[in-house]
Structures are given as C-alpha cells and as structure tokens.
C-alpha cells in the first residue's frame, strides 16, 4: 500500500506521499507519484490503495471538480454519490485525501466523505504511524505544515514495510 499525509497549519496545506508500489510482498517501484495537483493547481490530492484504481478515481474526481468549478466539498460529495451507485467504482480499492485552501477531506472506499476535526489526514498502510507523528509535532512544535508532513512521512517509512523514503510533497499557501 502506501502512506499519504495531509497537514494544515498557518495558511499552508500540504499533502505528501511516499513512492512505493508493492505487489504482495514485492516492491515493484520505488518512485511513484501518488500526490497530484488538480483543477488549475488549486486542489491537492493523494491516493492510497491500488494504483490503477487510484488513477481511475483521480480522473473521475477531476471531472467532478471541473463540473463544480473547483468547489471541493461539492465535488467530493458528488464523487461519493457516484462511488456508491456505480458498479465499477464500488469495486475500486483506494482512498483519496484531498485539500484546497478551505478544507481537507478523505473520500473513502465506501463512498464516505470525512472532514477531519483537526485538518490532519493520514491514510494507507503507514497512516496510523504518520498520524501519530504528525499529531505530536502539531501539538509540541512550531514546525510548518510542510516540515510536519515530511517528518511524519519519514517516521512512517521507518516503521511500515509498505512505505519508503521517496517523497512527493505538494503545498498550497493562502
């Protein structure tokens, strides 16, 4: 699987992800980009789960963003509706973490949209490790959102065998 983490602090939101693609217990690729910018570089998105499934979700989500003029919450809710009713989407095994300058969301494999209370998202096999590290850093340091995302991803990569140290980090400042 992978680890994706999103942190929001001091007018900055970041989504970061590692680059490992695994097939069973074998590492197939170490430098995959699982974090992207969407909708005229105004929305960040990261995925955890099956790579082919995630690319399908990226395409569908980007079309929803276009349809709703970049309104993240509306696009996410519409995507979730499709996910629940579309037979192809229901079989996709992936999670999306998405963020813009106003909100951060998780779109789950069940078609749920979750807005975390503290604007911290961590998904994937190393998500719990990254979330614990990011929470501690948010509560006990003055590090930037980017620094927290990077450090928490490093910690997750040190612990989780399905997460490596190759990082893709995207940020929005507002």
Swiss-Prot record:
Localization per Swiss-Prot or TrEMBL: Cytoplasm
Cellular component terms, GO, for this chain's entry? HslUV protease complex; proteasome core complex
Q: Which UniProt keywords apply?
A: Allosteric enzyme, Cytoplasm, Hydrolase, Metal-binding, Protease, Sodium, Threonine protease
| Pfam families per record | Proteasome
Provide the catalytic activity annotation.
ATP-dependent cleavage of peptide bonds with broad specificity
What stretch or stretches form a coiled coil here? none
GO MF annotation list:
metal ion binding; threonine-type endopeptidase activity
Class in the EC hierarchy, top level: hydrolase
Please name the catalytic residues of this protein. 2
Cystine pairs: none
- The enzyme's E.C. designation: 3.4.25.2
Q: Which HAMAP family match?
A: HslV (MF_00248)
Q: How does it assemble?
A: A double ring-shaped homohexamer of HslV is capped on each side by a ring-shaped HslU homohexamer. The assembly of the HslU/HslV complex is dependent on binding of ATP.
Protein name per its UniProtKB record? ATP-dependent protease subunit HslV
